[in-house]
Amino acid sequence: MDPLISAASVIAAGLSVGLASIGPGVGQGTAAGQAVEGIARQPEAEGKIRGTLLLSLAFMEALTIYGLVVALALLFANPFV
């Protein structure tokens, strides 16, 4: 295996996980903050807000998992070798 390809794969794997976690991290923080604010305004709607929040957090977390899958593919099933 060429050392340059190996080094580039490791760097690309790190970047894919790092960049894939920035957007969902910001989105999850914003969504949780807005959910807490909504529950504070209307405590009777807590169940509906919480259910919607958990579903949206799962969808946002899926984006980070896709970045992890790309990183694992680059590290262990490298298509460039």
Swiss-Prot record:
GO terms for molecular function: lipid binding; proton-transporting ATP synthase activity, rotational mechanism. F-type ATPases have 2 components, F(1) - the catalytic core - and F(0) - the membrane proton channel. F(1) has five subunits: alpha(3), beta(3), gamma(1), delta(1), epsilon(1). F(0) has four main subunits: a(1), b(1), b'(1) and c(10-14). The alpha and beta chains form an alternating ring which encloses part of the gamma chain. F(1) is attached to F(0) by a central stalk formed by the gamma and epsilon chains, while a peripheral stalk is formed by the delta, b and b' chains. GO terms for cellular component: chloroplast thylakoid membrane; proton-transporting ATP synthase complex; proton-transporting two-sector ATPase complex, proton-transporting domain. The chain crosses the membrane at residues 3-23, 57-77. Keywords: ATP synthesis, CF(0), Chloroplast, Hydrogen ion transport, Ion transport, Lipid-binding, Membrane, Plastid, Thylakoid, Transmembrane, Transmembrane helix, Transport. Belongs to the ATPase C chain family. It is a multi-pass membrane protein. In plastids the F-type ATPase is also known as CF(1)CF(0). NCBIfam families: ATP_synt_c, PRK07354.1. The record marks E61 as: Reversibly protonated during proton transport. The keyword Iron does not apply. F(1)F(0) ATP synthase produces ATP from ADP in the presence of a proton or sodium gradient. F-type ATPases consist of two structural domains, F(1) containing the extramembraneous catalytic core and F(0) containing the membrane proton channel, linked together by a central stalk and a peripheral stalk. During catalysis, ATP synthesis in the catalytic domain of F(1) is coupled via a rotary mechanism of the central stalk subunits to proton translocation. Key component of the F(0) channel; it plays a direct role in translocation across the membrane. A homomeric c-ring of between 10-14 subunits forms the central stalk rotor element with the F(1) delta and epsilon subunits. This is ATP synthase subunit c, chloroplastic. HAMAP family: ATP_synth_c_bact. It is found in: Plastid, Chloroplast thylakoid membrane.
